[in-house]
Amino acid sequence: MIRISDAAQAHFAKLLANQEEGTQIRVFVINPGAPNAECGVSYCPPDAVEATDTALKFDLLTAYVDELSAPYLEDAEIDFVTDQLGSQLTLKAPNAKMRKVADDAPLMERVEYALQSQINPQLAGHGGRVSLMEITDEGYAILQFGGGCNGCSMVDVTLKEGIEKQLLNEFPELKGVRDLTEHQRGEHSYY
């Protein structure tokens, strides 16, 4: 369910050493399955463990996950990264905003999942997003851009070189991607 790197485990173990004995960590999702879903990690003292929690045992600690958050934390990764600027804890949860769909789910659901879990997190850095409007009988995914992508001068490059390449690679049954957006350049546009 959740992978916690050795570096992150060591970081948590150091923090937990200063807490009440038996305290572990809790990994959770606020607003799971929603576009504004957020993941978090908190201390979990022994008296805060619920009977319905899933206990994930690691070498240096145990991570508790509540039953509502569990499906949205599938394939989540926690790491502790150090670079020239310092160190930081990273939590990647590709399924937090949308549950992972089955490999045999309808094409529309699988493409929507790829957009929400892989593409929109990248576009969010520019205040943008993309939505799947339909998949035509000819096999074209019809997308609509919003936020900072609407009116952005780089949207064609993003569509053809980024999104289309990624979707065609992942879904060979697609023939291409089309943009339905009526782009209006403005203050909201990224470029």
From Swiss-Prot:
Its cofactor is [4Fe-4S] cluster. Homodimer. This is Fe/S biogenesis protein NfuA. The keyword Iron applies. InterPro entries: Fe/S_biogenesis_protein_NfuA, FeS_biogenesis, FSCA_dom_sf, HesB-like_dom_sf, NIF_FeS_clus_asmbl_NifU_C. The keyword ATP-binding does not apply. NCBIfam families: PRK11190.1, YhgI_GntY. PANTHER family: FE_S BIOGENESIS PROTEIN NFUA, IRON-SULFUR CLUSTER SCAFFOLD PROTEIN NFU-RELATED. Binds 1 [4Fe-4S] cluster per subunit. The cluster is presumably bound at the interface of two monomers. Pfam families: Fe-S_biosyn, NifU. Gene3D superfamilies: Fe-S cluster assembly (FSCA) (3.30.300.130), HesB-like domain (2.60.300.12). One of its GO terms (biological process) is iron-sulfur cluster assembly. Disulfide bonds: none annotated. Involved in iron-sulfur cluster biogenesis. Binds a 4Fe-4S cluster, can transfer this cluster to apoproteins, and thereby intervenes in the maturation of Fe/S proteins. Could also act as a scaffold/chaperone for damaged Fe/S proteins. [4Fe-4S] cluster binds at C149, C152. GO terms for molecular function: 4 iron, 4 sulfur cluster binding; iron ion binding. Belongs to the NfuA family. Keywords: 4Fe-4S, Iron, Iron-sulfur, Metal-binding.
